Structures are given as structure tokens and as C-alpha cells.
């Protein structure tokens, strides 16, 4: 059994029991001075699921163009997803009432398991959802060799 943190934007009670670390996440950008970059990094949340055939990673990247995202494998087994959410052009006559969408650079790293076929990684960005598929190598079944008994 594994524990997976899930969120539901449609649940009106989802924020009733807040994550105690959310406060920390909101304070850190203010202290470090890296507000928008840290916010963009925090918003690049990804799911990783394993199927019998592959490891599948998904990230919601609304408004990010394919040219603004990089998917790489470094050090032989580390999947790196990085990119930049560009800031909307501001007009000096505009009066902002709320800014909640983050902008800046983001990067996520995942150490892949031994069964990952890193030479066959595929990625696609459709409707603001990045999907990275890392096929798995076939598990070789241990060979059973019958030994003749003499005598």
C-alpha cells in the first residue's frame, strides 16, 4: 500500500484541512526573494505512475508552449523536465487586482528505475498537459535448466 497525496479542485472542503507545509511553501519565496521563480517551480507538480509497460509522467503546464519546455535524461537515469512560464506583458495603464498565475523557470528531476529504457523516452504536450512516457525493459524470466542425473 502506498500513500499518494491527491488534490481535488472540485471539492469545496479540500482546503478545510490544509497541508501544514503549504504555509512554509508560501513563506519561503518571500524570505528568499525568489518569489516568482519559486512559485513557478512549486506549480510544476507532476504525477508519476508505473504501468506494466512504462513509467508515465504527467504535468499540467497551462499556457506553456512546447518550445518553452525541455525533457532530457542526464547522468544516464535522471529524467529532467524544465521550462519557463513567461510573464504576461504589462501595460502601464493596467490596474491589477490579483495576480495568482506564476511565471518564471521550473525544473523537476526524477531518478528512473533500473528497468527504464532511456533511449526510447517520448514526450508530448497536448491541451496544456505534458506527458512523458519512459518504456520499461522486459523482465527476463529466470531460465530453468534441467540437469540430467546420471547413475
UniProtKB/Swiss-Prot annotation:
Lineage: superkingdom: Eukaryota
UniProt cross-references to PROSITE patterns, sorted A to Z: SHSP
A matching Pfam family: HSP20
Domain (sHSP): residue spans on this chain: 37-151
Binding partners and assembly: Homododecamer composed of 2 hexameric rings, each consisting of 3 homodimers.
Family under the similarity heading: Belongs to the small heat shock protein (HSP20) family.
Protein name, UniProt field: 16.9 kDa class I heat shock protein 2
Protein species of origin: Triticum aestivum (Wheat)
Amino acid at each position: 500500500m502506498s500513500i499518494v497525496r491527491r488534490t481535488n479542485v472540485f471539492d469545496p472542503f479540500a482546503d478545510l484541512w490544509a497541508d501544514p507545509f503549504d504555509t512554509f511553501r508560501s513563506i519561503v519565496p518571500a524570505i528568499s526573494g525568489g518569489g516568482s521563480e519559486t512559485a513557478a517551480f512549486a506549480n510544476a507538480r507532476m504525477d508519476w505512475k508505473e504501468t506494466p509497460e512504462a513509467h508515465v509522467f504527467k504535468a499540467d503546464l497551462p499556457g506553456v508552449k512546447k518550445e518553452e519546455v525541455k525533457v532530457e535524461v542526464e547522468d544516464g537515469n535522471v529524467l529532467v523536465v524544465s521550462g519557463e512560464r513567461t510573464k504576461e506583458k504589462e501595460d502601464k495603464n493596467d490596474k491589477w487586482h490579483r495576480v495568482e498565475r506564476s511565471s518564471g523557470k521550473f525544473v523537476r528531476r526524477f531518478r528512473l528505475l533500473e528497468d527504464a529504457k532511456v533511449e526510447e523516452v517520448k514526450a508530448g504536450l497536448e491541451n496544456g498537459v505534458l506527458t512523458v512516457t519512459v518504456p520499461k525493459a522486459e523482465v527476463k524470466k529466470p531460465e530453468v535448466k534441467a540437469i540430467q542425473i546420471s547413475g
